[in-house]
Amino acid sequence: MAVWLVLFTLTCLLELPVYLLPLRPVLALRWGLLLLLGLNLATHPIVWFVLPRLFENQVHYVLVAEAFAVIVEGLIVGGIARWRRWESWGWLSAMGLSFLANACSAGIGELVGYRLVGWIGLLR
């Protein structure tokens, strides 16, 4: 669980600028931070604790996990945009933002995460 918490925090930190900068004109900073936390709480535990048990093939797992995160987070952002009537934000913008955020956290997280997991393992 400690490893997951470190990787969850890393994911949030990596996605922070990707979500907050484009949403800044329509969303106050504190609400942006809350949104970021909510998005990751909606997807990250499922990606880490549920989906790996469903797939033996690592490639299939990663593809499904990333698609799941992009779609769910995009739907949440798009739903909020529609509910709050953000004129410049539609479903396509929300999905694009979700894709970009998850691509950053998956790519950079893949590189850094293995090093962190190894480092955390040394502390045990």
Predicted features, each with a name:
Residues F8-R24, E73:
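N-terminal signal-anchor/start-transfer transmembrane helix
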Residues L23-L34, R82-G90:
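Membrane-interface helix-boundary motifs at transmembrane edges
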Residues L35-L54:
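A generic, lipid-embedded transmembrane alpha helix
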Residues T43-H44, V62-A81:
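Hydrophobic alpha-helical membrane segments
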